[in-house]
């Protein structure tokens, strides 16, 4: 299959002619306009900057998504959520989340690493524009009274960083056309990224968003309710969402 070389023009070739893993183009840049064009067509960049100093563009024809209403919360996760050990916020520490993701499995240093300075700058700019968002998971020490409030469901949506807390996990991604495009997640303690994903799904369900784009299947995401759809089904939902917003 051909891999297209992009130039400075704002365009993408038809991704249906790409490699089986979704790679179909190399080059261009990580400008805001190009990234928005990419995501509106289900295209996302990986920047293997230690191997090639140009973005690699992917668009798998087999898409792995989670529909917010279908998020699976296991019994053990429900127990963890009732314990009050963790507090969830949104857009309170985007920098901390993306840096945490970049350090996971040496995503910023290994050969083929993709989450390096160029990617971080681009998504930080998208965050400042209100397009990229983060979910943060904080480990906190609560009083017995605060724990009781958590168990009763109180304060779950408080978007305030508690005192004596540390960032132990989270995720970030792009909100566009009624969908959330997950980019990366990290955990410093067991299940922190699962907590972030559950919170995200609940948030998106309230906003009537169609799906969370997980990019590729993993056992972790499969256990949370992820499933496969075709690229045509994927784009039909994105386009319908875009038309509904007009």
Predicted region positions:
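N-acyltransferase acceptor-side catalytic subdomain
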Residues: 1-246
């Amino acid at each position: 299959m051909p891999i297209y070389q992009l130039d400075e023009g704002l365009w993408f070739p038809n991704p249906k002619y790409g490699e089986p893993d979704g790679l179909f183009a190399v080059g261009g840049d990580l400008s805001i306009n190009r990234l928005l064009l990419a995501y509106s067509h289900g295209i996302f960049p990986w920047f293997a900057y230690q191997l090639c100093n140009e973005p690699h563009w992917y668009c798998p024809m087999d898409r792995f998504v989670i529909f917010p209403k279908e998020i699976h919360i296991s019994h053990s996760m429900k127990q963890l959520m009732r314990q009050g050990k963790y507090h969830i916020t949104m857009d309170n520490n985007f920098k901390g989340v993306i840096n945490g993701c970049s350090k996971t499995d040496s995503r910023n240093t290994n050969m083929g690493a993709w989450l390096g300075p160029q990617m971080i700058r681009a998504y930080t700019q998208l965050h400042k524009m209100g397009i990229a968002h983060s979910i943060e998971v904080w480990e906190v020490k609560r009083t017995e009274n605060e724990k009781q409030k958590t168990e009763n469901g109180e304060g779950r949506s408080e978007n305030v960083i508690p005192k004596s807390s540390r960032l132990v996990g989270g995720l970030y991604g792009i909100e566009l056309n009624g969908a959330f495009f997950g980019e990366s997640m990290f955990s410093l303690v067991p299940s922190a990224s699962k907590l972030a994903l559950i919170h995200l799904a609940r948030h998106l369900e309230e906003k009537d968003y169609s799906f969370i784009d997980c990019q590729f299947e993993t056992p972790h995401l499969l256990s949370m309710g992820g499933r496969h759809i075709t690229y045509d089904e994927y784009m039909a939902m994105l386009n319908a969402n875009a038309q509904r917003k007009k």
